[in-house]
């Protein structure tokens, strides 16, 4: 169970449940790529070690306002308002680097599932993703006693807006 403790009351003052056709809007037709073929899932420690390699391309799959308050060291942060924009920007920007080792990360791992499948569909050869996203990374790094490579705060979708990663 994952939880956050906030001492000033409830994080959400209103709960709205909506049924959507996709968990994350990507603007892509379901038939254009295979969501069962995703990048390799990396543990927090594997991701942590690989982010220190200058040959590795670390890409933030979150929106620009999320990466502005926090990101991993040396990460490329697309200037995208939406995931729909970010996924296309990454393919276009790095189209000539399809053989390079790519590490993707996002808040909880959902956007990276789609992004890694899309990159593999477009011919990228070595795509990995941080399993469980920044949230899982923060918990594992703290448990292992390692110094985090995440700079700033992790954007959260409640009134706190950001959560420190130690």
Q: What are these model-derived regions, one by one?
A:
Residues 57-61:
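Short hydrophobic beta-strand that contains or immediately precedes a catalytic carboxylate
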Residues 40-50:
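Phosphate-interacting basic helix/loop segments used at nucleotide- and nucleic-acid interfaces
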Residues 105:
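Short, surface-exposed ligand- or partner-binding patches at beta-edge/loop junctions that are enriched
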Residues 1-40, 53, 63-102, 110-166:
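Rhodanese-like catalytic fold shared by cysteine-dependent sulfurtransferases
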């Amino acid at each position: 169970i994952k939880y956050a403790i906030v001492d000033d009351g409830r994080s959400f003052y209103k709960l709205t449940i909506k049924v959507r056709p996709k968990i994350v809007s990507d603007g892509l037709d379901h038939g254009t790529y295979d969501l069962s073929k995703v990048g390799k899932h990396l543990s927090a420690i594997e991701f942590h070690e690989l982010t220190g390699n200058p040959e590795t391309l670390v890409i933030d799959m979150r929106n620009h306002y999320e990466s502005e308050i926090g990101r991993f060291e040396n990460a490329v942060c697309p200037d995208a308002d939406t995931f729909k924009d970010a996924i296309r920007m990454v393919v276009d920007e790095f189209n000539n680097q399809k053989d390079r080792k790519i590490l993707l990360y996002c808040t909880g791992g959902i956007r990276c599932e789609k992004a890694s499948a899309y990159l593999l569909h477009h011919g990228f050869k070595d795509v990995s993703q941080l399993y469980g996203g920044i949230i899982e990374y923060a918990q594992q790094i703290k448990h292992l006693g390692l110094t985090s490579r995440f700079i700033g705060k992790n954007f959260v979708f409640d009134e706190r807006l950001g959560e420190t990663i130690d």
